Amino acid sequence: MGWMKDETGLDKNAANFVPLTPLSHLRRAALVYPEYEAVVYGDTRLSYAEYYRRCTRLASGLLAQGIASGDVVATLLPNIPAHAEAHFGVPACGAVLNTINTRLEPDTVAYIFDHGEARAVLVDTTLLGLVKAAIELMQGPAPIIVEVPDEQAGFPASGDHMTYDDLLAAGDPGYEWAMPQDEWESLALNYTSGTTGRPKGVVCHHRGAYLMTMGTAVSWEMSRHPRYLTIVPLFHCNNWNHTWMMPMLGGTVICCRDITAGAIYDAIADEGVTHFGGAPIVLNMIVNAEDADRRDFNHVVNVFTAGAPPPAATLAAIEPLGFSVMQVYGLTETYGHVTECLWHEKWDSETDESRYALKARTGVPMPMAEDITSMNAEDMSQVPKDATTQGEIMIRGNTVMKGYYKNPQATAEAFAGGYFHSGDIAVQHPDHYVQITDRAKDIIISGGENISSVEVEGVLMKHPDVLLCAVVAKPDDKWGEVPCACVELKPGAKADEAELIAFAREQLAGFKRPKKVLFQELPKTSTGKIQKFELRKVAKDL
């Protein structure tokens, strides 16, 4: 190892070792860029000095409500300034941030509240009904509700709860942030769908988030003062860590509450947006925008897209409009994207067909990832880099989660062999680029959001006419994938597609509902296991 013979007196100390945390970025930005725009939302424009003060008041206000170090503070918010502030203000008081998908149903939100033991929740006025319904289903104590109204969007405070402004007003602007004493301390708790049907709590540490911000800035070739549009939900992998990254560069976070083609074009033309991330559905939205929604702009907009390989036709249509698109890949367990389909100039002369095929590959490790490769999950051997032999994508590095909260068995399984097992099946090309060929564990990725097929199956199996059910992904031009339910009815049963979809609608969030129902005898193995790979073939041809 790299130790010299005599290292007496060369120990770590307060002068030469400081725990890495993305909180440092905003503290520095408040000093270095105090007058630069930090956050923009319609008529709201916050300088870095103001942004830092508001985050400080949030941290102090939470402490005044009894929030202690290590407590979980949840959010159910759209992409608005309060959500960006929560990314700094919550951990600045030592608490752990739990951003919750706003599209979930009450039962799942209740489970997340209970499992994470949320002490408080910052909730958009439009989502108060969801939170109250979830609290009714909880087993444990309810979180403190802090209502976040949005008068700019037409949603004033209900008057029934403490408001976000009340919380900030009670905070001390002179409060000293509680910076982590150990960079392994928990920063965020994010829930991800799994094949068990219940979401798993992914715990992220300060070190990983800090390194994500550094590596992303390098991969995106960012210079100072980028203008970043929040299309990726701030609840999704903490906005891929981009909100934590922007203060490092003195950049501007431009909040987008409602994602529409018109809103995107307006932000680019009026606010000079230089970067954004989004699923391929966002690219399709831009390409297929109505003429009335389109705006002219004279600069290149850099885009990270993830969730599915961008279709060649979409790339061919969007690039001439002024967008430079790179596919990235990652998971909640890896803080977001950890691979990039890095472009090489030698490919510029390739045919369009070849270029788009190259751009559809999953890519190579980003700078903050130690190793990402395709391996045989049985013996952890590297698969041949022949673009044909399939293996599982394995990931190792400092931007891999601490583990699954309160689930040591799942954590041990995920880290077996010294790598994180992604569950995604891929080949590896001779130039080391990985390319996903299939999704393992039956997760359906629709519009960038994960759907547990087991959860959907569990709901449909409650219908009195259903004997067996299997849910698989059906390719979809708009969403990438949508749930397709393959159902075997009980003898004499007469339920039809409309009835089953309506039944599912009563119990599932909109994006989880089956968009197609097929009635057939389900293929099974000799032991009675449903052969989903056969059903995927059927769904693919629909």
Predicted feature descriptions by range:
Residues 75, 104, 121-123, 276, ...:
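AMP-binding/adenylate-forming catalytic core of the ANL superfamily
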Residues 14, 18, 35-80, 84-88, ...:
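Conserved AMP-binding/adenylate-forming core of the ANL superfamily
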Residues 165, 248, 273-278, 287-357, ...:
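Gly/Ser/Thr-rich phosphate-binding loop
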Residues 210-227, 235-275, 288-289:
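Conserved AMP-binding/adenylation subdomain of ANL enzymes
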Residues 64-65, 92-169, 491-493, 506:
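Structural core segment of the AMP-binding/adenylate-forming
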Residues 52-60, 169-174, 188, 202-224, ...:
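Conserved structural elements of the adenylate-forming
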Residues 34, 146-147, 156-165, 169-191, ...:
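Conserved pre-ATP/AMP-binding loop-to-beta segment of ANL
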